[in-house]
From Swiss-Prot:
Belongs to the RNA methyltransferase TrmD family. Keywords: Cytoplasm, Methyltransferase, S-adenosyl-L-methionine, Transferase, tRNA processing. Its main location: cytoplasm. Its EC number is 2.1.1.228. CDD domains: TrmD-like (cd18080). One of its GO terms (cellular component) is cytosol. NCBIfam families: PRK00026.1, trmD. It comes from Leuconostoc mesenteroides subsp. mesenteroides (strain ATCC 8293 / DSM 20343 / BCRC 11652 / CCM 1803 / JCM 6124 / NCDO 523 / NBRC 100496 / NCIMB 8023 / NCTC 12954 / NRRL B-1118 / 37Y). Homodimer. This is tRNA (guanine-N(1)-)-methyltransferase.
């Protein structure tokens, strides 16, 4: 997979070359490039923004440097891939969107600043995505979040498909509590069932605790899920326990 980012602050993305994503880059599973679109300005002051026609507060990113930076990416990569604009007005990012983006071979993110974009920039764009109903000072943090969540679904990244598949939201439930050694930490005991060796009982406990955590923290997820009879029975039991 190739990921390009157009940004005015490319140094912000340096930490992304560490940890799991860094390993994927080292393995050749991910080609990660950040382009400073200020380098493509055609004015002597290297300005990338200007006042909006018709008046109004703030400054807008001008189209020329972004168009030319995109052309450079297209030349280097043999295409611009799926172009994503980070914008508060875009569709909201979530687990399913991350899975969807992971199916593409090439993604290009446009991370803006200032009041917004000249509307003509949207001609380059295939998708507009927002992290939520709030405004950040720039698109860089949003791009980082989306990239990190997306590349986890690439087979080469985690090295264990179960790591991604077992995460919260993968099956519509929050993840169950997990424990490691020691079994007794200063009087705080690991649930006995987890050390029993009874895999059927462990699976049932994990399902029940996933349901409990979802019921208590994100009941909206249960409304979207088609519960099995076993899940309904466990949920009834949880509700009586939590009263």
């Amino acid at each position: 997979m190739r990921i390009d980012v157009l940004s005015l602050f490319p140094d912000m993305f340096a930490p992304m070359r560490q940890s799991i994503i860094g390993k994927a880059i080292d393995k050749g599973a991910l080609d990660f490039q950040v382009t400073d679109f200020r380098d493509f300005t055609e004015n002597k002051h290297n300005n990338v923004d200007d006042y909006p026609f018709g008046g109004g507060a703030g400054m807008l990113l001008t189209p020329q440097p972004i168009f030319d930076a995109m052309a450079s990416v297209e030349k280097q990569a043999g295409g611009k891939g799926r172009v994503i604009l980070l914008d508060p007005a875009g569709r909201q990012f979530n687990h399913e969107v991350a899975q969807e983006l992971a199916t593409y071979d090439h993604l290009t993110f446009v991370a803006g600043h200032y009041e917004g974009y000249d509307e003509r920039i949207r001609e380059l764009v295939d998708d507009e995505i927002s992290l939520g109903d709030y405004v950040l000072t720039g698109g860089e943090l949003g791009a980082m979040v989306i990239i990190d969540a997306t590349v986890r679904f690439l087979p080469e990244i985690l090295g264990n498909a179960a790591s991604a598949e077992g995460d919260s939201f993968e099956d519509g439930l929050l993840e169950f509590p997990q424990y490691t050694r020691p079994a007794d930490f200063r009087g705080r005991m690991v649930p006995e069932v987890l050390t029993s060796g009874n895999h059927a009982k462990i699976a049932e406990w994990r399902l029940k605790e996933s349901l409990r955590r979802t019921y208590l923290r994100r009941p909206d997820l249960l409304e979207k899920r088609q519960l099995t009879q076993q899940e309904r029975d466990l949920l009834d039991n949880i509700k009586s326990e939590e009263q």
